[in-house]
């Protein structure tokens, strides 16, 4: 399962890089155009991320937008009507607890040893006192905050730049670094190995992924609508918001 995912995503990245290079060679930029298309080795303090695949990205943005309003939002709204907020927060806590190894390993890779210790303590407390992670006594009782750490962030701290912007179908906004980081995080996620070794677990894993995303959507309904309403160009607004969000996570 992991090998298949790696091959598919890395193949797409190679195609994207080749396409971006061809586009860069065929177009002579005007003096006031976007920054030149290049793979940077570090995050830039200011400026817009390169977007050589903008026509393709806009097409995927349009598809994702329609999927959200026609599929995800209606389903999430129905789910929200059936499951009370406390229950949905419990589901969120459960999946957050399951993916503790992702944050723990990345804290270690970033030399944030206190954060790694916090994640270890949180996992122990929430798995036991929190009933398999559905509750979060580590935060509420012991004041131990969850550490936000992922492999895309780790690569940024190591000095790798975002390269250029990518919009993936269903998954949404990303960049080259965060796409590689997403694949890296899959290797730290316990659910990946269950799906790899057990056929039935692969089906269950897909179901848990859908439930996780559905649950998260139900907890954030309205945020995307507000972004679209406030933006002259929602595509650019989302691109800039995502890029700034990721840069801020790396600088923490």
Residue ranges of predicted features:
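Positively charged n-region of N-terminal signal peptides that target proteins for export
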Residues: 1-5
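Bacterial N-terminal signal peptides
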Residues: 7-17
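Broad structural signal for hydrophobic residues in well-ordered alpha-helices, predominantly aliphatic
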Residues: 14-15, 79, 138
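N-terminal targeting leaders of membrane proteins
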Residues: 22-113, 200-252
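Mid-length scaffold segments of soluble, non-membrane domains
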Residues: 97-176
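Hydrophobic alpha-helical transmembrane segments and adjacent short intramembrane/lumenal linkers
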Residues: 157, 161-166, 173-206
């Amino acid at each position: 399962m992991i090998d298949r995912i790696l091959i598919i995503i890395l193949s797409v990245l190679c195609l994207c890089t080749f396409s971006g290079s061809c586009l860069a060679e065929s177009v002579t930029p005007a003096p006031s155009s976007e920054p030149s298309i290049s793979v940077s080795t570090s995050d830039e303090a200011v400026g817009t991320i390169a977007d050589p695949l903008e026509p393709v990205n806009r097409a995927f943005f349009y598809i994702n937008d329609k999927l959200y309003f026609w599929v995800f939002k209606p389903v999430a709204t129905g789910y929200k009507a059936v499951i009370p907020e406390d229950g949905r927060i419990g589901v969120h806590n459960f999946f957050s607890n399951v993916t503790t190894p992702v944050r723990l390993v990345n804290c270690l890779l970033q030399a944030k040893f206190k954060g790694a210790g916090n994640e270890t303590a949180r996992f122990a407390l929430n798995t036991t006192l929190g009933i398999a992670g559905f509750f979060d006594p580590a935060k509420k009782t012991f004041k131990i905050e969850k550490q936000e750490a992922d492999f895309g962030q780790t690569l940024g701290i190591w000095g790798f730049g975002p390269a250029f912007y990518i919009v993936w179908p269903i998954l949404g906004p990303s960049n080259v670094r965060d796409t590689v980081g997403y694949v890296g995080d899959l290797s730290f996620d316990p659910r990946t190995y269950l799906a790899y070794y057990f056929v039935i677990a692969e089906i269950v894993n897909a179901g848990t992924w859908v439930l996780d995303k559905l649950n998260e959507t139900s907890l954030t309904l309205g945020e995307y609508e507000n972004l679209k309403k406030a933006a002259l160009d929602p595509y650019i607004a989302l691109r800039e918001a995502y890029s700034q969000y990721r840069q801020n996570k790396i600088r923490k």
